[in-house]
Amino acid sequence: AQLYGEFKNLFPNNAVEYFVSYYDYYQPESYMPVTDTFIEKDFSMNEEIDRLRLKATSSLLQRKDVIVVSSVSCIYGLGNPKEWKKQVVHLKLDDSISRSSLTEYLVDIYYQRNDQVLERCNFRILGDIFEIFPAYEDKAIRVDIFDNTIQSIVSFDPLTGEEHSEHDEFYLYPARHFISDKD
């Protein structure tokens, strides 16, 4: 964490990202033959570190000036980066997309529909407006679709609803690292 902070100060124009284990607690499964006891695997995941891991991965696909602070053990078992990249949803102003297609894309990349509470890795549909809280961001995006055409893409604070910035395009990355091809 200290190195991450130092690199952010040293390289303010670069995407300095943090990719470490997201477990606050991890107990592997085990067997104690003396007492014939099986201990189940138990763990606790840190949601903020999971967000930072997904942010690091999305930055690697978006930018050329990325510095990732990580431990070596974290790079194993992430799955195929080509498959992950194929799942990215590119939203662009004036592009044609139906409500049902966007809903299907979001579900395919592990976002869950929740029309009540907007939280990380969820989306909701309010008429022709999609509100999506990317897994790797601290801001949500609002996509306004009219007549199957993207009219606007705006980032906003998911708690207050305050709009922050308009986008001409937005790349929406999967909500998990572990994804598979539909086939």
Describe the function of each predicted region.
Residues A1-D183:
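ASCE RecA-like P-loop NTPase motor cores
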